[in-house]
């Protein structure tokens, strides 16, 4: 079966996903595209032999669209995902599932009412080979009961439009989802520490930040977010257990011998660092649509991430430990291991 995909949003990530679906992933075809920038949509559609449509509603309602890819502006996600659920169509939604917790819950409730999973959220790190190796070891009991996790998320620079809350909402959201999945544990509180600010930042920005989380089991997670580190895109993760530790392996790098030493280039952005994970993520989605059973990060995971990010932003502003109070998980959604 070839999955016929309609795409809502042809910005940078939308174009990246369209390229993957047409050049890397097997079993998919782009048939319809829409964007608020009609000229851009037409240009992208022409490159893959798809047609343009006036709106997301038109894409979702099209009889020849089997599944929907939502890569539009974050505040529009809920509208499109809810429409896809109502139409009974599988939908891949880039993070965030929705920018507001209430909208995430509407999506969870709508999907639960249908009694079938249709939504997959774009948390690509679950498909990264290094993280998957860590997950296998943790699940197998290789380090004993997890006690702590240490994470680092560094970017070389960010644009002036990046503000302090985005350290949680756009950056650490990946660590938040990954650690929920990696530990199969729920985060119950958030705290943010403000270290000395780097001089390599815009005046309005608190950078770096250290985020502290506690899980239901009592495990502790610390996440360093430093988005103006200058030297490269650096992702680190270590889980400490009762009988051992497991660390995210560094990506393969080509060594450059020079002046008595060997230098290795450092990845400069997320697109390069997680290229293989993005490929695997979309292949998994297409395969699941073809087999009629959604997998991967769920609407519940999207809701939890948005709620935890909200608590983290509150903690940043208040300086307090902020509890995370999630609703009861509907029966449609299992644990964090999907």
From Swiss-Prot:
List the InterPro entries hit by this protein, alphabetically.
Answer: Gfo-Idh-MocA_inositol_DH, Gfo/Idh/MocA-like_OxRdtase_C, Gfo/Idh/MocA-like_OxRdtase_N, MI/DCI_dehydrogenase, NAD(P)-bd_dom_sf
Q: Which UniProt keywords apply?
A: NAD, Oxidoreductase
The stretch of residues making up the signal peptide is none
Q: Taxonomic lineage of this organism?
A: Bacteria, Bacillati, Actinomycetota, Actinomycetes, Pseudonocardiales
SUPFAM superfamilies hit by this protein: Glyceraldehyde-3-phosphate dehydrogenase-like, C-terminal domain (SSF55347), NAD(P)-binding Rossmann-fold domains (SSF51735)
Q: What Gene Ontology terms for biological process does this UniProt record contain?
A: inositol catabolic process
Q: Any keyword NAD?
A: yes
Q: Per its record, how is this protein called by name? A: Inositol 2-dehydrogenase 3
Look up the EC number in the record and give it.
1.1.1.18
Record's subunit section: Homotetramer.
**Which enzyme type, at the first EC level?**
oxidoreductase
Pfam families according to UniProt: GFO_IDH_MocA, GFO_IDH_MocA_C
Q: Which family does it belong to?
A: Belongs to the Gfo/Idh/MocA family.
- Provide the function of this protein: Involved in the oxidation of myo-inositol (MI) to 2-keto-myo-inositol (2KMI or 2-inosose).
Catalytic activity reads: myo-inositol + NAD(+) = scyllo-inosose + NADH + H(+)
GO molecular function terms listed in the Swiss-Prot or TrEMBL record: inositol 2-dehydrogenase (NAD+) activity; nucleotide binding
């Amino acid at each position: 079966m070839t999955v016929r995909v309609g795409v809502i949003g042809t910005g940078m990530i939308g174009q990246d996903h369209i390229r993957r679906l047409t050049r890397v992933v097997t079993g998919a075809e782009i048939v319809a595209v829409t964007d608020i920038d009609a000229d851009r949509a037409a240009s992208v559609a022409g490159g893959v032999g798809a047609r343009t449509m006036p709106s997301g509603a038109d894409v979702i309602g099209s009889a020849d669209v089997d599944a929907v890819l939502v890569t539009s502006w974050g505040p529009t996600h809920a509208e499109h995902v809810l429409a896809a659920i109502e139409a009974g169509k599988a939908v891949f939604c880039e993070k965030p599932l929705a920018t507001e917790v209430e909208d995430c819950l509407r999506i969870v409730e709508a999907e639960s009412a249908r009694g079938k999973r249709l939504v997959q959220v774009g948390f690509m790190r679950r498909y990264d080979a290094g993280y998957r190796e860590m997950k296998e070891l943790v699940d197998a009991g290789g380090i004993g009961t997890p006690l702590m996790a240490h994470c680092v998320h560094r970017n070389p620079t960010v644009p002036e439009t990046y503000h302090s809350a985005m350290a949680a909402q756009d950056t650490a959201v990946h660590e938040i989802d990954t650690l929920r999945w990696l530990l199969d544990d729920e985060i119950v509180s958030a705290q943010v520490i403000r270290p000395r600010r780097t001089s390599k930042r815009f005046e309005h920005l608190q950078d770096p930040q250290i985020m502290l989380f506690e899980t239901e089991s009592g495990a502790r997670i610390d996440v360093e977010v430093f988005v103006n580190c200058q030297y490269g895109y650096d992702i680190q993760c270590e889980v400490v257990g009762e009988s051992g530790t497991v660390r995210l392996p560094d990506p393969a790098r080509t060594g450059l011998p020079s002046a008595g030493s060997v230098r290795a280039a450092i990845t400069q952005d997320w697109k390069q660092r997680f290229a293989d994970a993005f490929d695997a993520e979309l292949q998994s989605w297409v395969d699941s649509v073809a087999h009629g059973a959604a997998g991967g990060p769920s609407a519940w995971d999207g809701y939890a991430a948005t709620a935890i990010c909200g608590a983290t932003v509150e903690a940043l502003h208040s300086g307090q430990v902020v509890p995370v109070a999630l609703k009861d998980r509907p029966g449609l959604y299992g644990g964090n291991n999907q």
